[in-house]
């Protein structure tokens, strides 16, 4: 196997297949890293070939470059951008548009210099400035003319863009008058980006509730008992447990779920977080002290979470994964139905284990509500506790469907419950991360 043509052909095939399968008019392909990095070279060579194969009139190369500010001399320097463009041109790619990443206005002189020495039209040098909110960037780039130069390069005749809805979103973000604190309990909290979709979904829900959302990061391995939970979680307005795999930190998550249930703090469990909710309920309400998941204790006596029956056997690990979009029926009178406002929904899944139906009736007899199931009623998709503002666990991943201007209904309901809880309780200060 060779880098060229085998790997580059595979990269191109992925791009072409995506365009064909989605019937897209335009495919946007981002090549990360820095020009000249060895890791990026096969990808850059592949997109160079795409331009030749599809015709340069059907391809627009946009190069994002850093324009650093030197405080000692109070000036922006264009040399790094010039060298980066020269490196890219040496690989056979001539940028059509150059986007200048800078903290402030670089000035017309810098833009003219980059235009001249990087061989692009002056109006194709676009500033991408540091903004108070990331969501202001589309408006900034539109005002700078990025849409016009891209459409011109691709010979696309498009109507004038209507960003009214986006402007309203920015206005809501700027005028938020409330703040709530959400504890995110997980095992990967040292790398916040591991929970990026969950973070953004919380922020989106905050926009709709006119509230800032501050995230209090909690490593589940530190939650050894209820005393530690009180230290870490006292004062938060809601607790969210996202997905994950493996047994590390599981006992701490169970402690957090117990604390949320006993203190009546809004709780949202996603995938593993739902399974944790079920395991805690089985231990502390049903009395099965050893209740667990067959993922962690394959030979356990009371595995309330188990591999689905039709997936048991000698199947490669990846083959047991339930992936993609599946329908779910919401039960009438539940928080799930209230949030969605309809009976049938569809959500994206990525899990291997499910609620063990051997314990279904017993769980329900002890108060746990099965609020969502597969259409045939066989698989439990969501559970909740009745009489709570929000104590919900879902087997699917709602964070994948949340958008800045269209918060996911479950996240929206969770933040609304957190704000209500905040009004009824004293708030304790944390050192959170803010959007």
Go through each PLM region and give its residues:
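N-terminal beta1-alpha1 cap of cysteine-dependent amidohydrolase-like domains
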Residues: 1-387, 398-435
């Amino acid at each position: 196997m060779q880098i060229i043509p085998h790997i580059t052909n595979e990269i191109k095939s992925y791009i072409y297949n995506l365009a064909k399968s989605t019937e897209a008019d335009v495919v946007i392909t981002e090549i990360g890293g820095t020009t000249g990095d060895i890791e990026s070279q096969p990808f850059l060579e592949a997109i160079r070939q795409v331009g030749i194969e599809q015709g340069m009139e059907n391809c627009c190369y946009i190069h994002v470059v850093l324009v650093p500010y030197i405080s000692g001399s109070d000036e922006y320097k264009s040399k790094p951008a010039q060298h980066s463009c020269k490196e890219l041109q040496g690989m056979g790619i001539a940028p059509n548009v150059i986007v200048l990443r800078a903290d402030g206005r670089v000035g017309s002189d810098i833009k003219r210099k980059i235009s001249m020495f990087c061989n692009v039209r002056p109006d194709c040098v676009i500033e991408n400035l540091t903004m108070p909110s990331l969501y202001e960037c589309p408006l900034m780039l539109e005002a700078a003319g990025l849409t016009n130069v891209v459409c011109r390069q691709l010979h696309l005749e498009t109507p004038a863009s209507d960003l009214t809805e986006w402007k309203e979103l920015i206005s809501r973000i700027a005028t938020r008058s409330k703040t709530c604190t959400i504890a995110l309990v997980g095992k990967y909290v040292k790398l916040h980006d591991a929970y990026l979709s969950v973070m953004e979904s919380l922020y989106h829900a905050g926009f709709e509730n006119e509230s800032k959302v501050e995230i209090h990061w909690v490593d589940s391995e530190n939650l050894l008992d209820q005393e530690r939970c009180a230290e870490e979680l006292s004062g938060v307005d809601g607790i969210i447990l996202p997905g994950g795999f493996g047994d590390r930190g599981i006992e701490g998550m169970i402690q957090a779920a117990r604390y949320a249930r006993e203190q009546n703090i809004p709780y949202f469990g996603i995938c593993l977080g739902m399974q944790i909710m079920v395991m805690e309920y089985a231990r502390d309400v049903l009395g099965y002290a050893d209740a667990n998941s067959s993922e962690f204790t394959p030979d356990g006596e009371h595995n309330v979470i188990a591999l689905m029956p039709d997936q048991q056997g000698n199947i490669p690990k990846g083959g047991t994964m339930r992936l993609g979009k599946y329908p779910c029926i919401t039960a009438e009178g539940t928080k799930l139905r209230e949030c969605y406002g309809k009976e049938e929904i569809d959500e994206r899944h990525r899990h291997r284990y499910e609620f063990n139906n051997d314990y279904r009736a017993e769980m329900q007899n002890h108060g746990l509500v099965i609020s969502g199931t597969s259409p045939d009623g066989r698989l439990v998709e969501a559970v909740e506790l009745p009489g709570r503002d929000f104590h919900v666990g879902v087997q699917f991943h709602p964070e994948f469907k949340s958008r800045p201007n269209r918060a996911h209904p479950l996240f929206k309901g969770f933040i609304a419950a957190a704000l209500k809880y905040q009004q009824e309780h004293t708030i304790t200060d944390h050192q959170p991360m803010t959007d």
